Amino acid sequence: MNQSYGRLVSRAAIAATAMASLLLLIKIFAWWYTGSVSILAALVDSLVDIGASLTNLLVVRYSLQPADDNHSFGHGKAESLAALAQSMFISGSALFLFLTGIQHLISPTPMNDPGVGIIVTIVALVCTILLVSFQRWVVRRTQSQAVRADMLHYQSDVMMNGAILLALALSWYGWHSADALFALGIGIYILYSALRMGYEAVQSLLDRALPDDERQEIIDIVTSWPGVSGAHDLRTRQSGPTRFIQIHLEMEDSLPLVQAHMVADQVEQAILRRFPGSDVIIHQDPCSVVPREGKRFELS
């Protein structure tokens, strides 16, 4: 795992924690001043943001540790655990918002000075957009699952702040139920995002295979290589930033062992050029012993 990856994901986690802390202080004041249930929803979400981002920061640092005697495949799965923990945090906040929205829908209460809430929400919206932009850039560079989960979380915050702006504006014009209705809608959306995030984390923990397009690229690299007659038993998974790739190459029976080994090394390097940092295991099989049943990839 290269130093650039560790530096970027750590900075993304620190930035998220710092931003969530700043927004929490701003929203506490805004809620105290206006009494808006939508701002209360945003405040609770910021509390969850801090917990999730702190968890993310600690777990990311752990996941960056190199492989050791007890964890020979590294610590990358800790990122999936962080994403799963975040989904639980977010689900809890969504339930709280939903219940609070119902309570205020039954007994709507006019808020004080919605203008202050609007200003605070605009500030929160701008700050969150800046954070999401930075996280998206980090995800493109690292493919970190933990940072991607955090980014999805803050993307939902962008939509939430937009909805809060609209709710505050409507409340300013006398429609006090709008505040509670938007809190309900925000809670439903956040719950959906949490469930989706949790599903992706569980799939990673269950060693889901790499995406179809990446597997096809691996097959194309292998089967187009000189000296390779075909391939079978491709197995893939991902742990943190590391892809694990296993495949059997089919070679002519008459090919000397040393030459077969050289071809396998060349194929491995070709895969690593396309997927840097991967853990690649290649086994060579003579064509005469390859079973004709099962998953095979032959030359076209």
UniProtKB/Swiss-Prot annotation:
This is Cation-efflux pump FieF. The keyword Electron transport does not apply. The gene is fieF. Divalent metal cation transporter which exports Zn(2+), Cd(2+) and possibly Fe(2+). May be involved in zinc and iron detoxification by efflux. Homodimer. It is found in: Cell inner membrane. It catalyses: Zn(2+)(in) + H(+)(out) = Zn(2+)(out) + H(+)(in); Cd(2+)(in) + H(+)(out) = Cd(2+)(out) + H(+)(in); Fe(2+)(in) + H(+)(out) = Fe(2+)(out) + H(+)(in). Keywords: Cell inner membrane, Cell membrane, Ion transport, Iron, Iron transport, Membrane, Metal-binding, Transmembrane, Transmembrane helix, Transport, Zinc, Zinc transport. Belongs to the cation diffusion facilitator (CDF) transporter (TC 2.A.4) family. FieF subfamily. Zn(2+) binds at D45, D49, H153, D157. PANTHER family: CATION-EFFLUX PUMP FIEF, MITOCHONDRIAL METAL TRANSPORTER 1-RELATED. It comes from Escherichia fergusonii (strain ATCC 35469 / DSM 13698 / CCUG 18766 / IAM 14443 / JCM 21226 / LMG 7866 / NBRC 102419 / NCTC 12128 / CDC 0568-73). Its main location: membrane. GO terms for molecular function: cadmium ion transmembrane transporter activity; ferrous iron transmembrane transporter activity; metal ion binding; zinc efflux antiporter activity. NCBIfam families: CDF, PRK09509.1. The chain crosses the membrane at residues 12-32, 39-59, 82-102, 114-134, 151-171, 172-192. The lineage of its organism: Bacteria, Pseudomonadati, Pseudomonadota, Gammaproteobacteria, Enterobacterales.
